[in-house]
């Protein structure tokens, strides 16, 4: 085999071994973000740097510059960097790099972070416990409002009933008094009418006696009979409705004809 062919073969083998070594070394370093590379503004993010080997120091770089650095834990394979609350300055490309015995490893693949403007309260969804508590509170408040409304309506109805009853009682007292006064006046009028009627009857009877006394019969004269009729209409008009049986008898006697015999 010519010498130059051997030299070319050795160079190819060396280059292949070097490339394999670089690929294996790159696969040993990984970087990721929790919960994800897109973060709402104001939240927190955790960047995880992982390696299969053991190193003394781990560094987080942003676009080739040191961003954060810390000592590794013994036998630790994952190293976390907590960042937040985040803002727009966090946006960019990040890498992980490790150091052991003052020798730095190669950088990991790139991780791009993005910060979006979003309200934190809107981005966080409420949990089931919060939702159940809120629904229970709403139901309880609705029941309370219903009970209070019913009690208020009952109290209002009772108040109106008492008010109307009291008002009717006040209006009924004057009416009763007026009715009593009217009945008393009617009784007084009836009593006065009866007294006047008895006086009239007595006067008529006296005048009747006087007439009988003046018209005495004379002996030897012809017997003449004269009938005198009393004014019955004037007597009956002055009577009242409520007349006792005794007064009725007196009025009947006053309406009879008086016969006077004249000799």
From Swiss-Prot:
Cellular compartments annotated: Membrane
Tissue-specific expression: Expressed in lymphoid and non-lymphoid organs.
Keyword Lipid metabolism assigned: no
Ig-like C2-type domain location: 27-112
Signal peptide residues on this chain, from the entry's feature table: 1-21
Record has Glycoprotein as a keyword: yes
Disulfide bonds: 49-96
Notes on the domains: ITIM (immunoreceptor tyrosine-based inhibitor motif) motif is a cytoplasmic motif present in 2 copies in the intracellular part of LAIR1. When phosphorylated, ITIM motif can bind the SH2 domain of several SH2-containing phosphatases, leading to down-regulation of cell activation.
Protein name, UniProt field: Leukocyte-associated immunoglobulin-like receptor 1
The species this protein was found in: Rattus norvegicus
Gene of this entry: Lair1
């Amino acid at each position: 085999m010519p010498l130059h062919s051997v030299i070319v073969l050795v160079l190819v083998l060396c280059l292949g071994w070097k490339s394999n070594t670089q690929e294996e070394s790159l696969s040993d370093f990984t970087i990721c973000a929790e919960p994800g590379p897109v973060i709402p503004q104001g939240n927190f993010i955790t960047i995880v740097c992982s390696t299969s080997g053991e190193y003394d120091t781990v560094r987080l770089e942003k676009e080739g510059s040191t961003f954060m650095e810390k000592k590794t834990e013994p036998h630790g394979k994952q190293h976390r960097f907590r960042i937040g609350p985040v803002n727009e300055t966090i946006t960019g490309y990040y890498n992980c790099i490790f150091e052991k015995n003052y020798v730095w490893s190669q950088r990991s693949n790139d991780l791009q972070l993005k910060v979006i403007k979003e309200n934190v309260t809107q981005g966080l969804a409420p949990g089931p416990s919060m939702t159940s508590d809120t629904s229970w509170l709403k139901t309880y408040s609705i029941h309370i409002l219903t009970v209070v409304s019913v009690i208020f309506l009952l109290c209002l109805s009772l108040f109106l009933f008492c008010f109307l009853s009291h008002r009717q009682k006040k209006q009924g007292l004057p009416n009763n008094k007026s009715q009593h006064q009217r009945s008393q006046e009617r009784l007084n009028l009836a009593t006065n009418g009866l007294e006047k009627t008895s006086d009239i009857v007595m006067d008529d009877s006296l005048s009747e006696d006087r007439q009988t006394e003046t018209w005495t019969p004379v002996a030897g004269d012809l017997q003449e009979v004269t009938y005198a009729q009393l004014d019955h209409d004037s007597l009956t008009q002055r009577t009242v409705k409520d007349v006792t049986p005794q007064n009725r008898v007196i009025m009947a006697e006053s309406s009879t004809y008086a016969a006077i015999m004249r000799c």
